[in-house]
Every structure is written in C-alpha cells, then in structure tokens.
Amino acid sequence: MAERGGAGGGPGGAGGGSGQRGSGVAQSPQQPPPQQQQQQPPQQPTPPKLAQATSSSSSTSAAAASSSSSSTSTSMAVAVASGSAPPGGPGPGRTPAPVQMNLYATWEVDRSSSSCVPRLFSLTLKKLVMLKEMDKDLNSVVIAVKLQGSKRILRSNEIVLPASGLVETELQLTFSLQYPHFLKRDANKLQIMLQRRKRYKNRTILGYKTLAVGLINMAEVMQHPNEGALVLGLHSNVKDVSVPVAEIKIYSLSSQPIDHEGIKSKLSDRSPDIDNYSEEEEESFSSEQEGSDDPLHGQDLFYEDEDLRKVKKTRRKLTSTSAITRQPNIKQKFVALLKRFKVSDEVGFGLEHVSREQIREVEEDLDELYDSLEMYNPSDSGPEMEETESILSTPKPKLKPFFEGMSQSSSQTEIGSLNSKGSLGKDTTSPMELAALEKIKSTWIKNQDDSLTETDTLEITDQDMFGDASTSLVVPEKVKTPMKSSKTDLQGSASPSKVEGVHTPRQKRSTPLKERQLSKPLSERTNSSDSERSPDLGHSTQIPRKVVYDQLNQILVSDAALPENVILVNTTDWQGQYVAELLQDQRKPVVCTCSTVEVQAVLSALLTRIQRYCNCNSSMPRPVKVAAVGGQSYLSSILRFFVKSLANKTSDWLGYMRFLIIPLGSHPVAKYLGSVDSKYSSSFLDSGWRDLFSRSEPPVSEQLDVAGRVMQYVNGAATTHQLPVAEAMLTCRHKFPDEDSYQKFIPFIGVVKVGLVEDSPSTAGDGDDSPVVSLTVPSTSPPSSSGLSRDATATPPSSPSMSSALAIVGSPNSPYGDVIGLQVDYWLGHPGERRREGDKRDASSKNTLKSVFRSVQVSRLPHSGEAQLSGTMAMTVVTKEKNKKVPTIFLSKKPREKEVDSKSQVIEGISRLICSAKQQQTMLRVSIDGVEWSDIKFFQLAAQWPTHVKHFPVGLFSGSKAT
C-alpha cells in the first residue's frame, strides 16, 4: 500500500505529520485535565505527541514509530492527525477552542472482486452534543469510524468533556478514508461511534465500550455529496432509533473515486522501509475487545487492522538485499543437485542402478538446501515452499491422453495400472519423473512378445471398454490396446517398487509431512468404495487381456440392440474354469475374468452400450441379466463397481441391470436366496452342487448338468429381489508410521466378520465365506509384519455410519490364540426390537459390549425365509469367559482354573455399530463379503448406503417366495 500523509492546521497553530508503512502517526493538542483547567494559568503550547494505530482483530502491536509511543501496530493503513493546542484552558467567559484533528486511513480493498472498488471518503465533524447522560463519571470520549461488517476501526484522540453534564463540544475533526465500496450489495454503511475507555474498579483497562452509534449510508453519499450542515443522531440502542442520546453536526460529507494512476506510481516506488522490515517488530499483546491499546496512552490515535497477516505476506515476498548477499552460493548448490538428477540418454534410465543410499543422499542434500534457503531468506511465507509439484517449472495446461489419470476419481481406484502402487498420477508427477516413467513403459512394452499394436482391429473401442472418465481404466500411456500376457509377465515386467523409487524422494522433500498423504496413491488414502490394490482379485498392475475384448466383441454386437444376458465367470480357480468351459462349449455369452480390472472393464463396457442404446431409442431398455459365477468375494467386486458407477447416474439406471448369483463354494447371499426361492435352492444349494465344487480338483467326467442348471436360471429368472446395500467404513493404519490413518468406504450386502477368517470352520453358521481367492496380501493396508504404531489421532467417533458382517481375528498378544479384546458400541434402529437374551436396553442410547471375543459377526441379510426387507442388522457375538479360580481342598497344589466357557449372543435391530480393539496398538482383520482387509484400527457399520443406490437387484425364479 502506498504511503499516505497529511497535515492540518487550526486557528491556534499548525501541525503536520506523515505516516509510513507499518505505523500510524498523529499529532494532536495536549489538553490539560478538567480539574486543572480552573487552577493553572495559561500554558505554552505543548509539543505534538505521537499517537498509535492498533489492530482490532488481533490486537497486535508492532514496532515503535516514535519516542513517546510505547508501541505501534503494523497495518495496511496510514493514519495522520494534526492540530494545535489551544492557547489555554477555558477561563471565565471564554469559549473553549474546538478540538482539532485530521485523521487519515487507507483500508485494504478486495481487488479480486469486480464489484468492489476503492473510494475516498471525507467527513468533517463540527460539534458533539450530549443529549443524555450515558455513563457515570464520563469525562472523556472517543469518536470512532468503522465500516459495518468490518473489524477495522479508526479512532480519534480522547476528547475531554467538562464536568457539567450535558454539554456541547466544538469539534474540527476531519476523517479521510480510502475504503472498499461494494457496488452489488448493501454493505456500505459507515458507523460513527461514541466510545469510552473500559474501566475496572476505577482503573482504566484495555478496550473500549461503545456508548452510542450512528449510521451513514455510503451509497447515498456517493450519489448526493453534501457540503451543508447535517445532524447525525447517535443511539445507544440500535432497535430504538427514535430517541437519540447524542448528536454530531456534520459540515461536509463526500465519497470520491480514487486516482488509479497516482496510486500505481506510488505502488511502483518501493520505499526503503520495506527492506528494513524486520520480524523483531512483531511484539503482540491481547485485549478483551476491539481497539485495544496500552492503557498508559489513552489520548493516542488508534487504528485497527484485521488483515495483518496479509500485509506481512505481501511485504515478505520482497527479499532483502542485505539478506541475499549472505546466502552462501545457493545457486551453485542448486545446479549441482540438478546435475545429479540428469538422465543420460546413452545409458537409459535404469532405476535398478539407483540404490537406496543414493536416494537418501539426495534427500539429505535437498533438505539441507531448503534449510539454508529458509535460514538466509527473511521470507516466512510458508505456502510458497509447500508445493506438491516438482521444483521444475509447472507444465502448461494441455489435454491429457485418454488413459492417463483416470483413477484420480475418488471412487474409481480399484482399477490397476503401472501407476497404482507407490506411484503418482499425472496430476502429481513432475516433468522429470514423467520422462523416467516414459522410458520405463517403453522398455516394458518392448519386452512383451505378444503385445498388440494400434493397428490391431478390435470392435470394442476404448470408450466402449472403459466408458467415461469416472469409470475408466488407468493403463500406461503408450498401451492403447490390451496385451496378451500371463500373470508372470505382469508380475515381472515393471516392478512397482521400481516405479515407486522415482517418486519417493520427490514426495519427501517437496511436501510437508501432513500433506504427503495427498500425493500418495489413491489406494492408500481414498475414501472410495474401492481400492487400487483390491484384496479379492488379481494384481494391481494388470490390464484387461485380449481374450476379454474378443469375448465382449461376440456379445456386444451393435448399438441398436442390447444382449439379453452376460455371464461373468471368475476363472482364477478350477471351479470357474470348469463352468466357463462347459458354457463355452454350448456357445453361451461368457466372459472369463481373472481380476477386478477385467470385471470392471466388462461392466463399464456394458454401461456404455446401455447409454448408447438410450441415446438412440426412445423406449426404455429391458434389464440386462448379468450372471456372476464365483464366490462371495467375486460378487463383492461387482457390487462395489455397481454402487460406485450408478452413484452419478439417475435412479432409472437402477433397473437397467439384474444380477444373477451362481455360487461356487460357500456363499451366504446364495444361502439366503435359496431360503426365499425353492427352485433356486434346488439348483445351486443341493448336496450334488455343493459336493462338486467343494473338491480340490475338477471331476474326470461330468456328473452334473452344470451348464443346464446355469442356463435354466439365466432364462427363468423373471423376478427381481432387492437386497439392501449397507456401508462399512474402515479406518486403516498407514504404511508409514508417521503418516495419518485413512478411511475406506465399502458397500456390502452379506456378512462382515472380525476374528477367525481362516479356512477353519466358523463358529456361526456353516462356515460362510472363506474367500475364494487367496487374501494373504490385502489391498487396503500394509503387511501385518510392519511395526505396530499407535495413532492417537484416529479414535472411534461418537457415532458410526455403516453396517455389515464382522469376524474377529486371533491376536498373538492375546491370552488365547483365537480371541481378541474388543469394544463394540451399537445403536438399535427400532425401540420394539430387543435382544434375544431378553435384556432391557434403551434403543435411543448407545449400548456397549466390552469383552474378550472369539468371534463377532454382523449380517445385513434378512432372516432366512423372509422376503420382506428390514432396515437393520443382526449381530452374533461369541465371547470367551474365564471362570474364577476354584481352590482345591486338602491339597497343596495351586488353585486350578476351570475351562474357558463360550457364550453366544444374538442382537437384532442394529442400525449403527462401531468396533475397535481395547488396545489402540492392536490392529484388526475384517472380512467383508468374503474380502479380507488388514491393519484396521477400527471400523463403523451402517445399515444403509448413503447414496440413492440403496439396493442391489438380484434375479430369482418366479417362485412363491420371491418378491
């Protein structure tokens, strides 16, 4: 802000002053106290005294600007008051001289708003009339000016009042304010306040008390300036404006535009006081109210500034010349570090040659460089250094390739890519790192023997396969078409750890500790319903195979017609491969999937074709039957994609697909469907089907008409049964101990377990759901072998927001290998529902179970045989309780302990639930719909998914029990 100054004179003399940045200067007459005016002879004019400018918002006082003022405040405005002392006190028959002050201020204007313009306001006050006694022992007042809605105040010196009660005081006060004028809202009201110093037990304290307030509409002043005499009434009660307690006579009132050219010329002149600005000037004190000040200087001029930090930020951007000379060869250090990152074109970019010691060396050098920059640079603007981008220049905005950056959606993170583990997306990768990744990807592609080129003809286009950005796959930029490769090729081609090595040093040196989480892969921090490293299927670096495209081309023939049904088969085990082979022999519409990436690619292509059909036809499409042949974890991957994809679509899309569940192995959802549909039960839940797919090897000869049963279900499913979708929120421990925990939101329709999730028989039911796919490396969290770290910031909230079924995992620290200490807080959904044990509980309050549990299981499925949906969950807990020691009689042996007893409880009608370990350092393993998630600090369950996708449509036969 430019310098402002002013001078003014009165009848009795002249005075002047000038203000500089960061201080306010005022000259005012020093009048004797009232009790001395009648006793002392006239005195010579006293020398002018410096005043103060204070900040009302933060009560911050900075560097002294004169010898008599104890402290002055740093501010965007400059205030000057001038005047001359009267020749003497008012003797008998003499009219007291008017109180003379010229007050200047420049208030900051929000230049980012087009409707806010700076204007200059001029106000001259001639007389103060006290109509009522406003306070006892009132001997001095202050006239303050403030914009309504702002905390910045410009105050005059204290005006000493005679002790005669109701008085008239002659004034010669001039206020000149540069203020922000808003053109499009009614926020231009100027408050003229009559204030006095606060007192406590006859002692002056910091702060001011407002006695009366008057309002001036600046919009009217701008349109109709006034040079005549006006009377402004001041009211002690804003609601009662009919009776003023004081009046101020105004001589002139105007609002004028600012000369922008003059301001620009002043702004271009960098005065020396900017370079001399020092951090030592910031000595602050606090007060109770706006307008605080040192109580020893009650006669000073006060100025308040709320935006003090903004001023300091703009000033500190100008680096001190003297400070620059002290920097020890910063440029040389910087160039030397850049050379260490230079990539040699002849050798190529081989990350395998970069050791951890070299990376750590570079990190330490960069940390030392940044420390030296902060040490020798007086700038304290934190955000300038807290950048998530590279230290190189930010690239110009441009359109990204279609496949790049697609997984940045908060809900689409389960799709794997080269960028999915330990690497950053396009948005958080520097140009240097992008060049390294390009070389990695190019060498990786060259090593693939059967890789396809862009000239290969595929009827399924990229848009068909991956849909829009919210449902797209993230694959390497140069890989436009799927590659035909085995699992070993995918695992051994581009190691994620190599890619991760490129980004780790950059993250640690260019981002603060709290912000590093934002630059991590979405799989480690997302709040979505999916994960890039999904624990149930495949690896994160996989992309759809060519066979998936070929099978889709045979099913999705044209845009004019939609297929009646699509059969998705999980071929990661022999059961799925066996069923797929039988169906393919009969030329059924089968798509074999081996990973979550392929599942989502098929469903995304199907949604895209449905969208094209709706665009080309006026009639609504009939539901497409999507059969899911696999275990519970396979259905969970389909459910997560369904919930996430349809969250951004209208409710009509909920009826465009109908899912058919064909179980291979244990499946709690299929077990429930069999209880409401007898024909479904006879097809997939009989002993023949169960015995066939529970074997370890496929049968030599076909003992069962598997394809016939599947197609009978596909063709005969004419009824839709809506299964409620519940929500589970997992609070997971981060891979790095110093990082904050992160949350994951997962939809489910079946059972969640905490406890025994191995393949051993379960304590409840018939061992529902051990995952079909190996879950030794869960996708949400770091390995269980990493050190346990206590995170005090991640504690269970007061109320949960999700629901599911739980299972408890054995803890090595537990007194028993198969139990764990848990605390389960739950809320009942309906007062009428109560626990089967018959205990009375308040349904509206929290209920707590704190014990050593063998298993905890929460189910969202309705009761067996009930087709009517319920809005609550049911929890089954099995606790282990050790009885007290029983002393033995007539024997000298130690008291023996009775065997541990198990106690089972079933609690129904639960709407919300929170489960956490008794010890914060204990991490949980949770199985949700057959998918295991590790390193869970605590989790919450709610009976309903929060979006409009609240049900999962499942097709059944037209049996009597189906709805």
Swiss-Prot record:
Residues 276-293 have a biased composition (Acidic residues). GO terms for biological process: lymphocyte homeostasis; protein localization to Golgi apparatus; protein localization to plasma membrane. Residues 53-72, 770-804 have a biased composition (Low complexity). One of its GO terms (molecular function) is transmembrane transporter binding. Residues 1-72, 78-97, 262-299, 377-428, 476-542, 760-804 are annotated as: Disordered. Associates with AP-1 and AP-3 but not with AP-2 complexes. Interacts with FURIN. Forms a ternary complex with FURIN and AP-1. Interacts with NPHP1; the interaction is dependent of NPHP1 phosphorylation by CK2. Interacts with PKD2 (via acidic region). Interacts with SORL1. Interacts with WDR37. This is Phosphofurin acidic cluster sorting protein 1. It comes from Homo sapiens. The lineage of its organism: Eukaryota, Metazoa, Chordata, Craniata, Vertebrata. The gene is PACS1.
